């Protein structure tokens, strides 16, 4: 008879923390109806529905999102993707006015929490980009963040989009957020000199800066990927927006499919597939939280399915 030898117990596997892939989704995008059915949900963990607009009195202008937020939430949840409402200024100066006035600030906090609950969302995202008089206004922004953090329900996610390196957020900011989305793009884009607005080197520096200077945990830091570029080409002036921005889909349309594996053609600068892949690899190899995309509707269309940047992100981050 065999002695009663205890069987070896299976050892628990080390937990693999899933990387986040946060896609901004502009609910008032002019291509929404055509492109929403083509979203690659399997490669996303979160979407930030943009934007509910902050007014000076602390109320929200929800017209840009009201019509579609519920159907988008239902689709996201069906695919096990979390959805947050992203908050930005209504018109220049209004967000700042709201956070600087204690009464409006209190109203704004209540409105954000109420909106998140009413529409059964998973949280909210603060996209404050009023950079003038930063040092004067930042203390109010910090009070606002703390107030939101204390007012929210425990299971509500609280995230933000931040400027990558040239503003001082200090070491207090990060503690209130689950994820901090670094806008590692738009560098030098608003000048007359053609320039790469989102280089790999700057991406790496931004991530390290937030970890080392602002003491944000790597598990909160999310690197931003642009699905668009800028063009200074005379021949493309009819294809760009008022700040020379052009969607990745537009770059392929006007410059040809070979653009997909480059970062610039002539005076048009963007991130092609290899750079997007390398940025994702850096995130994984260095244990940052994940990547954020601005924004999903700028990607290649399904007639160029193999050239879609989201497929590169999905392959690198999920597989």
Where in this protein do the model-derived segments appear?
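Substrate-binding surface in catalytic domains of secreted glycosidases
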Residues: 25-26, 56-67, 110, 130-255
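Bacterial Sec-dependent N-terminal signal peptides
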Residues: 1-16
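Conserved, mostly hydrophobic/aromatic
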Residues: 47, 85, 126, 180, ...
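Glycan-binding loop/region signatures in secreted carbohydrate-active enzymes
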Residues: 43, 218-287, 302, 306-319
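Active-site and adjacent substrate-binding regions of carbohydrate-active enzymes
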Residues: 125-162, 273-319
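Short acidic catalytic loops
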Residues: 46-51, 116-132, 183, 290-296
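Short, well-ordered coil/turn segments that N-cap beta-strands
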Residues: 19, 43-45, 79-83, 120-122, ...
């Amino acid at each position: 008879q065999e002695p009663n030898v205890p069987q070896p117990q299976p050892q628990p596997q080390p937990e693999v923390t899933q990387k986040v892939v946060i896609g901004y989704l502009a609910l008032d995008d002019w291509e929404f109806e055509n492109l929403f059915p083509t979203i690659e949900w399997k490669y996303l963990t979160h979407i930030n529905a943009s934007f509910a607009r902050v007014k000076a009195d602390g109320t929200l202008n929800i017209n840009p999102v009201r019509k579609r937020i519920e159907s988008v939430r239902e689709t996201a949840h069906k695919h096990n993707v979390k959805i947050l409402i992203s908050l930005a200024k209504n018109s220049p100066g209004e967000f700042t006015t709201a956070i600087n006035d204690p009464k409006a600030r209190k109203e704004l906090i209540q409105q954000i929490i109420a909106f998140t609950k009413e529409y059964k969302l998973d949280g909210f995202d603060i996209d404050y980009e009023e950079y003038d008089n930063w040092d004067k206004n930042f203390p109010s922004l910090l009070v606002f963040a703390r107030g939101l953090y204390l007012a929210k329900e425990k299971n509500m996610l609280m995230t933000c989009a931040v400027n990558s390196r040239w503003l001082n957020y200090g070491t207090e900011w990060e503690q209130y957020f689950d994820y901090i989305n670094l806008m590692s793009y738009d560098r030098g884009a608003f000048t007359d000199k053609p320039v790469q607005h989102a280089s790999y080197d700057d991406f790496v520096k931004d991530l390290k800066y937030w970890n080392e200077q602002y003491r944000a945990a790597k598990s909160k830091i999310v690197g931003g990927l642009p699905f668009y570029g800028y063009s200074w080409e005379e021949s493309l002036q009819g294809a760009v927006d008022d700040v020379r921005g052009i969607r990745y889909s537009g770059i392929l349309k006007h410059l040809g499919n070979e653009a997909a594996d480059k970062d610039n053609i002539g005076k048009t600068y963007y991130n092609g597939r290899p750079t997007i892949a390398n940025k994702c690899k850096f995130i994984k190899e260095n244990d940052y939280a994940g990547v954020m995309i601005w924004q999903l509707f700028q990607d290649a269309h399904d007639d160029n399915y193999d050239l879609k940047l989201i497929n590169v992100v999905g392959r690198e981050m999920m597989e």
